[in-house]
Amino acid sequence: MARPPVPGSVVVPNWHESAEGKEYLACILRKNRRRVFGLLERPVLLPPVSIDTASYKIFVSGKSGVGKTALVAKLAGLEVPVVHHETTGIQTTVVFWPAKLQASSRVVMFRFEFWDCGESALKKFDHMLLACMENTDAFLFLFSFTDRASFEDLPGQLARIAGEAPGVVRMVIGSKFDQYMHTDVPERDLTAFRQAWELPLLRVKSVPGRRLADGRTLDGRAGLADVAHILNGLAEQLWHQDQVAAGLLPNPPESAPE
């Protein structure tokens, strides 16, 4: 795997907040609510604009209860489950995200297909893990700030994937950051982890999203602002990896964790 790029060096970080960015975001919103896309659907820009689409498959990995389903729900603009229920089988969710490239100032529509599978199903049915890993472009490794064991489990997961799928993007996300005052994972441990693995480590809150004036409907624009750093991070890592694989960028040697 190529060494991760410097954050903000591949895509323009706050472009989604600009006037141009908001025009593109309008195609994934409807009346300030997020649009839900099926596997065969895609957003339509008005007026029609020629835009390339980059599609990626992403497997969300982590212990049961760390918030995998909640994370995907937030990324897709859906309601975050209040009570934990083990995901039965494989659940796929499509999320579109427009981003502007730093080098060319070109806008690309990123299509992320998130695969989420319950831990029990993965252990019981071997073919489910194979299906989730097949042709996967990126792995999102989740831990919970309120579950020390989920953080300590990360090195084993990362080492296993590095051996089985060495060419894929790996990112780490800490969930339930809204409960950071009660964290079981102090900042010094996060710093040591980043230094050892040299991987992107992002944080996300697991609370329900902000609402529109009716008090019931999720605010689509506010929800996008809450997860923009994750979607931009994925776009950046995956686009950079493609450029390296195509020989358009040099691939610096990867440092092994100590």
UniProtKB/Swiss-Prot annotation:
Its biological purpose: Required for efficient primary cilia initiation, regulating a late step in cilia initiation. Plays a role in the final maturation of the mother centriole and ciliary vesicle that allows extension of the ciliary axoneme.
GO MF terms, alphabetically ordered: GTP binding; GTPase activity
Entry similarity comment: Belongs to the small GTPase superfamily. Rab family.
Key words, A-Z: Cell projection, Cilium, Cilium biogenesis/degradation, Cytoplasm, Cytoskeleton, Exocytosis, GTP-binding, Nucleotide-binding, Protein transport, Transport
Annotated spans, Small GTPase-like: 50-258
UniProt key word rRNA processing: no
Binding site for GTP: 64-65, 67-70, 82, 84, 87, 176, 178, 206
UniProt cross-references to InterPro entries, sorted A to Z: P-loop_NTPase, RSG1, Small_GTPase
GO cellular component: centriole; ciliary basal body; ciliary base; ciliary transition zone; cytoplasm
SUBUNIT field: Interacts with FUZ. Associates with the CPLANE (ciliogenesis and planar polarity effectors) complex via its interaction with FUZ.
Protein name: Ciliogenesis and planar polarity effector 2
GO BP, sorted A to Z: axoneme assembly; cilium assembly; cranial skeletal system development; endocardial cushion fusion; exocytosis; limb development; protein localization; protein processing
Locations listed in the record: Cytoplasm, Cytoskeleton, Cilium basal body; Cytoplasm, Cytoskeleton, Microtubule organizing center, Centrosome, Centriole
Pfam families referenced in this protein's UniProt entry, alphabetically: Ras (PF00071)
